Curated annotation (Swiss-Prot):
Chain segments annotated as transmembrane: none
Record protein name field: NAD(P)H oxidoreductase RTN4IP1, mitochondrial
CDD domains in UniProt: RTN4I1
Gene: RTN4IP1
Gene3D superfamilies on file: Medium-chain alcohol dehydrogenases, catalytic domain (3.90.180.10), NAD(P)-binding Rossmann-like Domain (3.40.50.720)
Disulfide pairings: none
UniProt organism field: Bos taurus (Bovine)
Length: 396
């Protein structure tokens, strides 16, 4: 049924990684992992061997099962995963320069050694193995997580993640439902809470505008803003208006029915704007913020990774710094805050999100599910855009 593995860990690494967790579990020093076949050291996975279009996706039965290398890591048996736009972009090589620097800061490896690369950021599954310093989880726990993009992804039978990136799955959700949330939820949480400074204590009555409201990030953002008693205006297409209203949006603007800027002129100013669209949006959106009141515009569409792909690490970071610095200063003098936000993997934040889920304040929004054998079709679905929620992969 399985095999035994004994791992030697770096004793001085991350000894306090789970200080924010209160529950302690006891683990034996040698544990057992159940795999697809007896004595197996390989697993099924979807990988890419080079960057490109959908044809580069390849199914293999021979991907090496991940090993625990640090004492704060856990191995999860993947029950469900999901496809995000970042996965489609990474398949095509987006962000490769910066992500490879994160994978190999000393540039020891030669170019292309990130392959075979497994995509997929979301996971809901069961803990199979725990590092020696993991105290909050034990084998058999049902968990969910979002894996940082520089790590091997979740479109495989097993995935290894840091313990501080993992959270106990909400009991009210199936694995399929749970896999739809972590990446988009943490991205929205980063923008709204960590960067925007909004929370359940200061959000009541705030006027919030969400641009690109019908995708994964937008549908989560609507729900968390309504859970915190904000007034939400959602911008999406007409065919998504019923969805966002069901999620709690107070006002809905159809961007296809006319100029959004013109439609917003009759609205009161906003305290917070979340931009999932980018492009020319920021050239007009900020003027709808309340001036000199602490109002904030946060965009999730930034040139950070593209700059490094195009200019290299040093010049790309310099260009990025100049861009965000100049825009921040420009809008500061106009009485509003301009900010960028990014996905941040965080088990503690997922704990907070799980509480909202269990309280019935957050519902997963799933547009379509695919079996593990249909991963390429799922990528094409996400690549076509116009999402009405998430695309989920049932691995088990």
């Amino acid at each position: 049924m399985g095999f035994l593995k004994t791992c030697v860990f770096r004793r001085n690494a991350c000894t306090a990684v789970c200080f924010w967790r209160s529950q302690v579990v006891q683990k034996p020093s040698v544990r057992k992992i159940s795999t697809t076949s007896p004595r197996s050291t390989v697993m099924p996975a979807w990988v890419i061997d080079k960057y490109g279009s959908n044809e580069v996706l390849r199914f293999t039965q021979n991907m090496m099962i991940p090993m625990i290398h640090y004492p704060n890591e856990v191995i999860i048996k993947v029950h469900a995963a999901s496809i995000n736009p970042i996965d489609v972009n990474m398949r095509s090589g987006y962000g490769a320069t910066a992500l490879n620097m994160k994978r190999d800061p000393l540039h020891v490896k030669i170019k292309g050694e990130e392959f075979p690369l497994t995509l997929g950021r979301d996971v809901s599954g069961v803990v199979m193995e725990c590092g020696l310093d993991v105290r909050y989880f034990k084998p058999g726990d049902e968990v969910w997580a979002a894996v940082p993009p520089w790590k091997q992804g979740t479109l495989s039978e097993f995935v290894v993640v840091s313990g501080n990136e993992v959270s106990h799955k909400p009991r009210s959700l199936t694995h399929t439902q749970a896999a739809s949330l972590p990446y988009v939820a943490l991205t929205a949480w980063s923008a709204i809470n960590k960067v925007g400074g909004l929370n359940d204590r200061n959000c009541t009555g705030k006027r919030v505008l969400i641009l690109g409201a019908s995708g994964g990030v937008g549908t989560f953002a609507i729900q968390v803003m309504k859970a915190w008693d904000a007034h939400v205006t959602a911008v999406c297409s007409q065919d998504a208006s019923e969805l966002v209203r069901k999620l709690g949006a107070d006002d809905v603007i159809d961007y296809k029915s006319g100029n959004v800027e013109a439609q917003l002129k009759s609205s009161k100013p906003f305290d917070f704007i979340l931009d999932n669209v980018g492009g020319s949006t920021e050239t007009w959106a900020l003027k709808f913020l309340k001036k000199w009141s602490g109002a904030t515009y946060v965009t999730l569409v930034t040139p950070f990774l593209l700059n490094m792909d195009r200019l290299g690490i040093a010049d790309g970071m310099l260009q990025t710094g100049v861009t965000v610095g100049s825009k921040t200063l420009k809008h500061f003098w106009q009485g509003v805050h301009y900010r960028w936000a990014f996905f941040m993997a965080s088990g503690p934040c997922l704990d907070d999100i799980a509480e909202l889920v269990e309280a019935g304040k957050i519902q997963p929004v799933i547009e379509k599910t695919f079996p593990f054998s249909k991963v390429p079709e799922a990528f094409l679905k996400v690549e076509r855009g116009h999402a009405r929620g998430k695309t989920v992969i049932n691995v088990v």
